[in-house]
């Protein structure tokens, strides 16, 4: 909640902080930076620590790369990395002088909700933003309302297009 979801969709200081406080008020113990199976086992939490239940929140999955030349150049990020950097460095706040790198023109490859979030975030950082997707608009996996908002905000779409190299 803190890192991958843009501020414009989920205000951290208001919504996330209040949700965490309400969960803690219910008596839930939150442990972060724990690697299940390494630093602690599920069995030890249930048997030795006396927990009645364990929730494993594994976070977002690993990004999928296209295996094309140039995709590991400086300034090329996975959408999750870009969103995390933006949130951690509070680039969405005008009173912060955040050194996040977003070029004057940004291309986001993909058509899911995370791609829409990354594109809309880049737009808010002042970039002319285009979403490139290999299929038709009807086949976009993002929710229709996310696509609508992206278009409404001025994001361009290049459909039936797939990059072969980053130059």
Residue ranges and their predicted role:
Residues 16-65, 71, 77, 81, ...:
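A Rossmann-like FAD-binding core segment of flavoenzymes
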Residues 110-112:
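Glycine-rich Rossmann-fold phosphate-binding loop(s) that bind the pyrophosphate
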Residues 4-10:
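Short glycine-enriched, charge-decorated loop/helix-capping segments at active-site entrances
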Residues 115-116:
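N-terminal Rossmann-fold NAD(P) dinucleotide-binding loop
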Residues 119, 123:
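Gly/Ala-rich phosphate-binding loop of Rossmann-like dinucleotide-binding domains
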Residues 1-4, 72:
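Gly-rich Lys/Arg/Thr-decorated short loops/hinges at beta-loop-alpha junctions or inter-strand turns
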């Amino acid at each position: 909640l803190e890192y991958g979801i843009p501020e414009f969709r989920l205000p951290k200081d208001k919504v996330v902080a209040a949700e965490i406080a309400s969960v803690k008020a219910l008596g839930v113990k939150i442990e972060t930076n724990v690697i299940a199976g390494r630093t602690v086992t599920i069995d030890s939490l249930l048997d030795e620590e006396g927990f009645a239940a364990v929730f494993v929140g594994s976070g977002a999955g690993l990004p999928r790369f296209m295996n094309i030349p140039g995709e590991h150049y400086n300034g090329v990020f996975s959408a999750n990395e870009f969103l995390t950097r933006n949130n951690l460095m509070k680039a969405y706040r005008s009173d912060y002088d955040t050194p996040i790198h977003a070029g004057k023109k940004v291309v986001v490859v993909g058509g899911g909700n995370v791609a829409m979030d990354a594109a809309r975030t880049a737009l808010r950082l002042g970039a002319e933003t285009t979403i490139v997707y290999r299929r038709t608009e009807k086949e976009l996996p993002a929710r229709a309302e996310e696509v609508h908002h992206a278009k409404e905000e001025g994001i361009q779409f290049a459909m039936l297009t797939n990059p072969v190299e980053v130059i």
